[in-house]
Amino acid sequence: MAPQLLSFANATKYSLLPSSENLLMTKSFKRNKTKSHYPFQYKPLSPKNPTTLITCSSVSNLSTPKVEKAIEEEDLQFEEEELEFEEEEKPLNEIWKEIQGSDNWEGLLDPMNSHLRREIIRYGEFAQACYDSFDFDPHSKYCGTCKYHGAHFFEKLHMANHGYQISRYLYATSDINLPNFFQKSRLSSVWSTHANWMGYIAVATDEEEVKRLGRRDIVVAWRGTVTYLEWIYDLKDILCSAKFTDDPSIKIELGFYDLYTKKEDSCTYCSFSAREQVLAEIKRLLEYYDGEEISITFTGHSLGAALAIISAYDVAELGLNLTNDVDSTRNETEIPITVYSFAGPRVGNLKFKERCDELGVKVLRVINVHDKVPTVPGILANEKLQFQKYLEDATNFPWSYAHVGVELALDHKHSPFLKDTKDFGCAHNLEALLHLVDGYHGKDKRFVLAMKRDIALVNKCCDFLKSEYGVPPHWRQDENKGMVRNSDGKWVLPERPRLEAHRPEDTAHHLKKILKRATTTNGSPQLGAI
């Protein structure tokens, strides 16, 4: 008998009511597995307990007549200029490996391939979901966790039409030296004194979506920072050896390394490091879907982009993307590993970049040229320095960093919808970046919204749209900021179902398998802190 697909938390005690907004998702899931295979099980609503009516989402219906008129005029002008953009004759399921970077996106960025544009935005929305579901409110005892139970995660964010199901939530200990990144409650009674929710792992379960994609996709989405850039000042700009390999010359930034590898034995959520959580869950899913065409895609924004690259490298370095055991009679096949990085900083040194290339980790970095985050760390020595390799090899220069992968550089000044601002947070904003992807068709080509993505999304967490469009800044929030009336008629923040940590015995079981494989393959374990 096959193992259960997802062995996460028990059923939610309190359920959240569906939003009153018009949902974008209309496709019903056609699952060929029972509900017991999914991580979060459903239970009926509890009439005795307060519930929350959520009216916020990762999508928007705030478009004003002025916005719609501007887009219509843009479309007319676009048609009059008779600009021609390449339309792919082949469906995505026939060219998905190229779209995932098998040829380093050669010929797909200029002009922008329409399949690639949609995939960049789709994975960007997976990263944005980490923000839209995160509780930033310091007045809530749930500050630092996810607002939604995994069984309802994509539904609450109006993303059920993406065809994915949450497999596992990811946590990291906040007891490291990045105080401006972690969110903590001001209350004495809190959900956890050590942990912060860091993202999730999801898998394509809708068979129609799997058919469209051409494979079973596993996505790892990391939370970063929406517009706040204070965390940059916490970086020590210190490189440390990545203990995922025997080569000490491969180095990554110390703060990123600590965030990925540190754990807190006394904490239910962080008794396993974020690294261990990711590796164990990917191992489990690959075993469950053994024999299928699979891809592993990492995505993240800002600091989350750094974690996406590190975890993708880690999976490849350990050979988890090699589908069969070493003693198997079948030949091993390599599962593609792709990273969609949004506004990410540099992660490691030139040796780290070169090793990612050797392992076949494909990274597409999407940036705004006015954003400062992609310029750090490594201001003194980086990939733009002609003699960087000599500097690292001959002098062991301790502050040398290099970006990994292919860069898609966009400019927010090319969008007619965005105002000129000196707010660095706007240039760093993920929704603004996805807006730029939607309008980009190639170098020196006019900005035209190809997917007609709602421009109101840009102002979800910032003030970047021109005021003439009538979209308020920072508009996204829960109705009444999550407050509800209890049975006594008083306004309170409702209790949420407890998010149980993933079963430790399950995580330990799959980590043991990884360790055995690493030892068998190389004669010595490569798991470092594990």
Residue map of PLM features:
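Beta-strand elements of modular eukaryotic interaction domains
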Residues: 188-193, 199-200, 207-211, 286-288, ...
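Extended, Lys/Arg-enriched charged tracts that mediate electrostatic binding to polyanionic substrates
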Residues: 146-205
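Short, surface-exposed "cap/lid" segments of acyl-processing enzymes
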Residues: 192-248
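Catalytic nucleophile loop
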Residues: 305
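Serine hydrolase/lipase
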Residues: 2-119, 216, 252-253, 257-259, ...
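Structured beta-strand/turn binding interfaces of compact recognition modules in eukaryotic regulators
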Residues: 123-132, 146, 151, 202-206, ...
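Short secondary-structure subsegments characteristic of cysteine-rich extracellular domains
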Residues: 55, 88, 123-129, 248
